[in-house]
């Protein structure tokens, strides 16, 4: 691609110019809405074409957009695609690369230990000056020993890069909130500063605030921090966790009970096996023993709190937990486009308990995520469901030991009041997580998994607990059916001591095994089997109640119903409604489909394909850039962070093939295109898998990259480093 973009290019002029220019080989195509003949109930919508003419694995690009050898420009996408859970665990896979040696060799073309360089001022501005008027800074605690700059005019002239001219030179943070949280460090500081003359004749630089914007940006929900961010804990609270000053009495008591009960069960079951081997028959005395067996075991130290009622339905598509890509700005974007529920990136339990700053940052949610979903169920569908108390944001954790998960759940639900659910990841396939005994390794230890979920349910206060699982760890040995029965009814160990169900509120099944990778499709027929099982178990829940004593409601799933979500390869509204109508899941969790085209939630809501024009797609990129600056700051560091995550997003969105270019519908997430061109230059640019084009797109909104900025995509062939 030879077209260059000056750093002052804006969406309004740059995008339109690219759409309207171009050689005669590019067709101009306005935004279109391709709508199928949809029946009244969109669940039963059928694809337009039966796919008989389609070549498996190849996107059916229309002849006029194919590029033959020697023609330019063109797009031919590579197939270095990671499956849903690999995308979810990207950050943890990178840790494996830090160990080097054999592990690094095993990754082959993958950049596992990625580095992104630095984006910072040549010399930083002291915090005592960063938000103060020029002539009245706060006192610096380091005095003459401070290594940062205190002369504001010198900093602005010599150490800070020139202001960005994107967004018409207006700071997106100041425009949204009436003040800029980056102060003098902002790359748009010229848009919210002025020089005033004092009574003594001196001139002073001051930051400007806008009261009208500030009032309009007041949070709609109590408890939010600056920028409408929720679940942000203080430095003091993190220090208390690091120094083990914050106690977790519930987790400690329940873990002790679990350990003692497990030992008793082991002794008891050993005795039963010995009796069976010696053909001891069950006489009257033995039957009496069965009835009073539970008296030999201690009761749990406390019962779970009553849980907030949940609802999942066909009108509530869910955004999957996505590490790296599932950051706050991206989730905010998806909620705006129609996602009803979101999850944090997968957080590791032990760092949460130890107060690690990076892990606690994953708990932060945007204001739009702590509001109730925009759609509520019909009256009476869910007993005692209170829509006003519901919210969209849940967290996902990973753990390999019960005490870690319990402590993490207890402190999270205590310190973060805006959580819909705490989800346990039991499906992460990454070797580092698996070898540690977490993620999909828990599928091989169902009793341990049940203990973890029971404990989490006991200490999570009113917040429900859920689990995300895979079909199993090996291709030909699916275990999800047995595991689901255990999680819904309770395993034999806990049933024997009268503890009943595990209390899990929802289960998500990814239709792949740990062994399986993206090259094969998710198994929705198996997901359908599991959905049928859960329906039967939910319908029979009253009949399956403990026969010795009635199980306490607090031990049951909220509302005595376990919701079931399917996950894997959902790429259109047709895939979504087919999964609900034919497979019988309550709703679908969407991962790669949302990364490749975030407006999939709009399509689901509309029940039709949306053929986004190139400028419409670029406006989504622009919106992500704005939300990134709001979340990470508009200073040099924040701009660099936003650029890094924008490039991560573009590494997925470039794989989207506009449906107006396809010969047959529906599009398939596994299909790869032959070399093709877009309907205009901008559309071709957005489809490029060349990292240089991704950088070019980022510069439309974030200006030229810092000289020390470096970007290493997942695949080594796409690395980028600024050349000074």
Curated annotation (Swiss-Prot):
* Region feature (Disordered): 1-135
Q: Which residues form the active site?
A: 428
UniProt catalytic activity: 5,6-dihydrouridine(47) in tRNA + NAD(+) = uridine(47) in tRNA + NADH + H(+); 5,6-dihydrouridine(47) in tRNA + NADP(+) = uridine(47) in tRNA + NADPH + H(+); a 5,6-dihydrouridine in mRNA + NAD(+) = a uridine in mRNA + NADH + H(+); a 5,6-dihydrouridine in mRNA + NADP(+) = a uridine in mRNA + NADPH + H(+)
Gene Ontology biological process terms from the UniProt entry: mRNA processing
Q: So what EC number does this one have?
A: 1.3.1.89, 1.3.1.-
UniProt KW keywords:
Cytoplasm, Flavoprotein, FMN, Metal-binding, mRNA processing, NAD, NADP, Nucleus, Oxidoreductase, Repeat, tRNA processing, Zinc, Zinc-finger
Sequence ranges of Polar residues compositional bias: 1-12
List all Basic and acidic residues biased stretches.
29-41, 88-101
Mention one GO molecular function. flavin adenine dinucleotide binding
Under the heading InterPro entries, the entry gives: Aldolase_TIM, DUS-like_FMN-bd, tRNA_hU_synthase_CS, Znf_CCCH
Q: Where in the cell is it found?
A: Cytoplasm; Nucleus
Question: A single GO CC term, please?
Answer: nucleus
Q: Which cofactor does it need?
A: FMN
The record's listing under PROSITE patterns reads:
UPF0034, ZF_C3H1
Tell me the residue numbers annotated for binding FMN: 321-323, 396, 468, 510, 567-569, 591-592
Where exactly are the zinc fingers annotated as C3H1-type?
A: 120-153, 171-192
Q: What does this protein do?
A: Catalyzes the synthesis of dihydrouridine, a modified base found in the D-loop of most tRNAs. Specifically modifies U47 in cytoplasmic tRNAs. Catalyzes the synthesis of dihydrouridine in some mRNAs, thereby affecting their translation.
Q: Which family does it belong to?
A: Belongs to the Dus family. Dus3 subfamily.
Protein name, entry field: tRNA-dihydrouridine(47) synthase [NAD(P)(+)]
Which organism does this sequence originate in?
Coccidioides immitis (strain RS) (Valley fever fungus)
